Amino acid sequence: MIDIGANLAHESFDLDREAVFSRAWGAGVQAIILTGSCRQSNRAVQQLRLTAPDRLYCTAGVHPHHASDWTDEDAELITSLAAHAGLVSLGECGLDYHRDLSPREVQRKVFIAQLELAIRLEKPVFLHQRSAHDDFHAIVREYRAALPDACVH
Protein backbone atom coordinates (compact mmCIF):
# COMPACT_ATOMS: atom_id res chain seq x y z
CA MET A 1 0.00 0.00 0.00
CA ILE A 2 1.27 3.47 -0.93
CA ASP A 3 -0.04 6.79 0.38
CA ILE A 4 0.16 8.99 -2.70
CA GLY A 5 -0.88 12.37 -1.30
CA ALA A 6 0.65 13.12 2.08
CA ASN A 7 0.96 16.77 3.09
CA LEU A 8 3.28 15.86 5.96
CA ALA A 9 5.73 18.71 5.44
CA HIS A 10 3.12 21.11 6.80
CA GLU A 11 4.04 22.70 10.13
CA SER A 12 0.96 21.20 11.78
CA PHE A 13 2.84 17.88 11.74
CA ASP A 14 6.03 19.22 13.35
CA LEU A 15 5.22 17.73 16.76
CA ASP A 16 4.02 14.29 15.69
CA ARG A 17 5.40 13.65 12.19
CA GLU A 18 7.52 10.72 13.36
CA ALA A 19 4.50 9.18 15.10
CA VAL A 20 2.50 9.54 11.87
CA PHE A 21 5.23 7.71 9.96
CA SER A 22 5.44 5.03 12.63
CA ARG A 23 1.68 4.42 12.51
CA ALA A 24 1.77 4.28 8.71
CA TRP A 25 4.60 1.74 8.64
CA GLY A 26 2.84 -0.28 11.34
CA ALA A 27 -0.38 -0.31 9.31
CA GLY A 28 1.40 -1.80 6.32
CA VAL A 29 2.05 1.34 4.28
CA GLN A 30 5.15 0.54 2.23
CA ALA A 31 5.83 4.02 0.85
CA ILE A 32 4.59 7.57 1.18
CA ILE A 33 4.65 10.24 -1.50
CA LEU A 34 5.06 13.63 0.17
CA THR A 35 3.20 16.38 -1.68
CA GLY A 36 4.84 19.65 -2.65
CA SER A 37 2.38 22.47 -3.21
CA CYS A 38 4.38 25.72 -3.08
CA ARG A 39 7.99 26.86 -3.21
CA GLN A 40 8.52 26.32 0.52
CA SER A 41 6.89 22.89 0.68
CA ASN A 42 8.69 21.74 -2.48
CA ARG A 43 11.99 22.28 -0.68
CA ALA A 44 10.66 20.84 2.58
CA VAL A 45 9.39 17.56 1.11
CA GLN A 46 12.73 16.98 -0.61
CA GLN A 47 14.54 17.37 2.72
CA LEU A 48 11.99 15.28 4.60
CA ARG A 49 12.28 12.54 1.99
CA LEU A 50 15.94 12.13 2.84
CA THR A 51 15.04 10.92 6.35
CA ALA A 52 13.78 7.62 4.88
CA PRO A 53 14.80 7.56 1.20
CA ASP A 54 13.80 3.92 0.77
CA ARG A 55 10.19 4.66 1.83
CA LEU A 56 9.60 8.37 1.23
CA TYR A 57 9.21 9.95 -2.20
CA CYS A 58 7.98 13.39 -3.18
CA THR A 59 6.32 15.63 -5.71
CA ALA A 60 7.05 19.25 -6.58
CA GLY A 61 4.53 21.70 -7.91
CA VAL A 62 2.33 24.69 -7.21
CA HIS A 63 -1.20 24.03 -5.97
CA PRO A 64 -3.89 26.25 -7.52
CA HIS A 65 -4.35 28.02 -4.17
CA HIS A 66 -0.76 29.28 -4.57
CA ALA A 67 -0.91 30.00 -8.32
CA SER A 68 -0.65 33.77 -7.75
CA ASP A 69 2.80 33.19 -6.22
CA TRP A 70 4.16 31.40 -9.34
CA THR A 71 7.35 32.87 -10.79
CA ASP A 72 10.17 31.65 -13.00
CA GLU A 73 11.89 30.65 -9.75
CA ASP A 74 9.24 27.95 -9.24
CA ALA A 75 9.87 26.47 -12.67
CA GLU A 76 13.62 26.52 -12.02
CA LEU A 77 13.22 24.91 -8.58
CA ILE A 78 10.92 22.18 -9.91
CA THR A 79 13.35 21.50 -12.76
CA SER A 80 16.23 21.23 -10.29
CA LEU A 81 14.29 18.95 -7.92
CA ALA A 82 13.17 16.74 -10.82
CA ALA A 83 16.78 15.59 -11.20
CA HIS A 84 16.57 13.84 -7.80
CA ALA A 85 15.58 10.17 -7.93
CA GLY A 86 13.03 10.56 -5.14
CA LEU A 87 10.93 13.09 -7.03
CA VAL A 88 8.32 10.90 -8.68
CA SER A 89 5.83 13.45 -10.01
CA LEU A 90 5.12 17.11 -10.68
CA GLY A 91 2.27 18.59 -8.71
CA GLU A 92 0.13 19.03 -6.93
CA CYS A 93 -1.19 21.22 -9.72
CA GLY A 94 -4.52 21.92 -11.34
CA LEU A 95 -7.57 24.11 -10.81
CA ASP A 96 -9.60 24.91 -7.70
CA TYR A 97 -12.57 27.21 -8.22
CA HIS A 98 -14.16 26.30 -4.89
CA ARG A 99 -12.29 28.94 -2.90
CA ASP A 100 -10.70 30.95 -5.73
CA LEU A 101 -7.65 31.77 -3.61
CA SER A 102 -5.89 32.66 -6.86
CA PRO A 103 -7.70 34.22 -9.83
CA ARG A 104 -9.03 31.62 -12.26
CA GLU A 105 -7.08 32.92 -15.24
CA VAL A 106 -3.87 32.77 -13.19
CA GLN A 107 -4.71 29.21 -12.11
CA ARG A 108 -5.18 28.18 -15.74
CA LYS A 109 -1.89 29.75 -16.85
CA VAL A 110 0.07 28.16 -13.99
CA PHE A 111 -1.59 24.78 -14.56
CA ILE A 112 -0.62 24.87 -18.24
CA ALA A 113 2.93 25.97 -17.37
CA GLN A 114 3.30 22.96 -15.06
CA LEU A 115 1.87 20.53 -17.61
CA GLU A 116 4.34 21.83 -20.19
CA LEU A 117 7.15 21.49 -17.65
CA ALA A 118 6.11 17.90 -16.86
CA ILE A 119 6.17 17.06 -20.56
CA ARG A 120 9.62 18.60 -20.98
CA LEU A 121 10.96 16.81 -17.87
CA GLU A 122 9.16 13.56 -18.76
CA LYS A 123 7.54 13.34 -15.32
CA PRO A 124 3.99 12.26 -14.48
CA VAL A 125 1.66 14.78 -12.86
CA PHE A 126 -0.33 14.72 -9.62
CA LEU A 127 -3.47 16.70 -10.45
CA HIS A 128 -5.98 18.60 -8.33
CA GLN A 129 -9.48 19.61 -9.44
CA ARG A 130 -12.27 21.09 -7.37
CA SER A 131 -15.33 22.83 -8.77
CA ALA A 132 -13.49 23.42 -12.07
CA HIS A 133 -14.39 20.36 -14.12
CA ASP A 134 -15.03 21.96 -17.52
CA ASP A 135 -11.85 24.05 -17.64
CA PHE A 136 -9.79 21.26 -16.07
CA HIS A 137 -11.04 18.69 -18.57
CA ALA A 138 -10.43 21.00 -21.54
CA ILE A 139 -6.83 21.67 -20.48
CA VAL A 140 -6.03 18.05 -19.63
CA ARG A 141 -7.56 16.87 -22.90
CA GLU A 142 -5.24 19.23 -24.80
CA TYR A 143 -2.08 17.96 -23.05
CA ARG A 144 -2.93 14.35 -22.12
CA ALA A 145 -1.37 12.65 -25.13
CA ALA A 146 2.01 14.23 -24.39
CA LEU A 147 2.00 13.68 -20.62
CA PRO A 148 3.99 10.69 -19.35
CA ASP A 149 1.19 9.81 -16.89
CA ALA A 150 -1.25 11.41 -14.48
CA CYS A 151 -3.09 10.84 -11.22
CA VAL A 152 -6.14 12.98 -10.46
CA HIS A 153 -7.71 13.54 -7.07
For each predicted feature, which ranges?
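Mid-domain alpha/beta scaffold segments of enzyme catalytic cores
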Residues: 1-152
